[in-house]
Each structure stands twice: as structure tokens, then as C-alpha cells.
Amino acid sequence: MKTVPFEQVILRGCGIDVHKDMVVATISGEGLKTETRSYKTFSSSLTELKEWLLSSGITHVAMESTGVYWKPVYKILECPDMKVWIVNARHIKYVPGHKTDKKDSAWICKLLLAGLLKPSYIPEREQRELRDLTRYRNKLIQHVSSEKNRIVRILEDCNIKLSSVVCSLDGVVANKLIDMLIDKGHVTMDEITCIYHKKLEASPELLYQACEGFIEPHHIYMLQTIRKDMEQTKAIIADLACRIKEVLSPYENVMELLQKIPGLSRKTVEDLIAEIGVDMEAFPTEKHLASWAGVCPGNNE
């Protein structure tokens, strides 16, 4: 079969095949002899790789988005003197004739020089760090919600029907009742009357009936442990909120404008900026933005 040469559109490039413990890099281009080297994924080794690429005059670097292993490589290679591209593995997955790691890196390099690779959008470092904070906060919020559901299940196990007579166990009265149950294992009608609020739909008598369960030492221990975990997690969430506010302080005007949109709270705006940023020039059309935000159908056939 006749070999068809690629037209070179990039001056000097490097293709990198990334693995957990090793990266294989191939350089080629104008004035360069094609060369392949392997490096460990330790920071010192990746720094050596960066120095080799810069000394060789490499202008573009391309690598597949392999799991999470590409991230430290990207962070170390990222610099003003080189464009580092992360490419979708599907763009080169089905190309035949490359079975070893060295050939993989050489093939990526060849496709890069020919201009046949399209870089994925990678947010700036500041936005990536902000996204780490907001996503971690959301995970912790989900954890607190999960622990609330665990409390409901434990109370149901004790045949305490608070969740059936109050709208939410987050309310002031419900929290005080749970605290009393944890402290003493029971509540009295007088205690319910003292903390009762007229806004509650349930009567004091109905609350008392709902609290007439059989709470045991094991249940008390579980409830105490869960409440302690929730309090600690809420403290971390509050710390994260302060850190996020500090990071977003340069964009306070943008945030105020976005919060004028009905339904957008401050937290929602913080999450929005963390996910899509404030520079919409990164997205050619609204469809690209929707795809990046994960709110459009996918086709993975």
C-alpha cells in the first residue's frame, strides 16, 4: 500500500503517551531528528522532560486525556513558551498500525504536526482551582444530606415518627426534639409545650405521640456520632465558602449581575463561574457551551 505523507502545519511538536508510572515522548519537526524518550512520572523526571522539550524548541505538545494521569503532566509542562494540548482519545483510537507505547507517542506527534488533532478546552489554572473548591463543597453538602436521611432511618427504626408529622427535620423544633431524645431517650409533654411554635401544622399532642418510640443506647450512640459528623462537615463547608468568596472577589461585579437572574443564588453563581468561567470566547457557539456544561444529549455509539 502506498504511503501518503502528511503536510506539516506545525513547526516542531511532541506527542506524549501517558501512563500511571511512565510517559513516552516523541519529538519531531523542522530542524529536528525524530527522537523518542521515556520518563518516569515523578515531578523531577517530568521537569527533565519539560527542559528537553524547551531546549529542542518544541512549540506544541499533544497528549491523550488518559484518566487523571495527564493532569500532573499538563501542570508541569504548562508554560508560555509551549502550547500543551489535551486531545480526545477517540480522535486517534481507531487508527491502525501502532501497537507499542513508542509508536503511540510517534503517531500522536505525526498527527499533531499535520494539524489533524483538535485541542480540548482546558480552563485556566485559577478556574481549575476554583472548580476543585466548589465541587468538593457540593460533595460535602451531599454528604450532610445523606446523613440527614440516615437520622430519619434510625428514628424510624426506633418507631419515632417525627418525619411523618413535621415538614423537615432541619427545623428548630425538630432539632430540639432530636437533641432531647439523644440526651435522655424520651421527651415529656411539658418539654414539647415549651419549644412548640404556632407555625407548626402538627399539634403538641401529635408531636408527643410521634416521639413515643423505644430508643435504645445503640440508637443514641449512632445519632450522637452522626450529628457530630454533620457539625464537623458543616464547619468545613463554611470554611470552603469563605475560600471560594475570597477567590471570586475580583469578579464580584459579575456575580452581582448574575444574581439578578431569577432563581440564581450566590452559591449557584459561584458553581456556574467555576464550571464555565467568565470568558465566553472559549466557546464558539452556545451549543459548545451547553456541551461543555453537560446539559445537552450525548452520542456515544
Question: What is the predicted role of each segment?
Answer:
Residues 1-301:
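A detector of single, family-specific signature residues
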